[in-house]
Amino acid sequence: MTEGRRRQFKVGRVVSNKMQKTVVVAVDYLKPHPLYRKIVRRTSKFHAHDEQQCQIGDVVRIGETRPLSKTKRWEVVEIIKRNEEA
């Protein structure tokens, strides 16, 4: 029997919750430009499973999980900070 690898976690903000039980989470990271070596902010978007709890603007922690659909491989583990405006 093989051991599974360690589960990855990412922290990002919810940018869309228009789907049922799915949110889109934007995760920012810094990466150097390949030629000029200036640090540039980049954004990746992940579809994550959510049981109708998150609102747009919430800061959440997402964790890797088994494939739930064609695009969903992440689930919301916890809501770190609620959006005050919503």
Swiss-Prot record:
One term under GO cellular component: cytosolic small ribosomal subunit
Signal peptide boundaries: none
Keyword line: Ribonucleoprotein, Ribosomal protein, RNA-binding, rRNA-binding
Key word Acetylation present: no
Example of a GO MF term: structural constituent of ribosome
GO biological process: translation
Keyword Lipid metabolism carried by entry: no
Subunit comment: Part of the 30S ribosomal subunit.
Family, similarity comment: Belongs to the universal ribosomal protein uS17 family.
HAMAP family: Ribosomal_uS17_B (MF_01345_B)
General function of this protein: One of the primary rRNA binding proteins, it binds specifically to the 5'-end of 16S ribosomal RNA.
Protein name in the entry: Small ribosomal subunit protein uS17
Gene: rpsQ
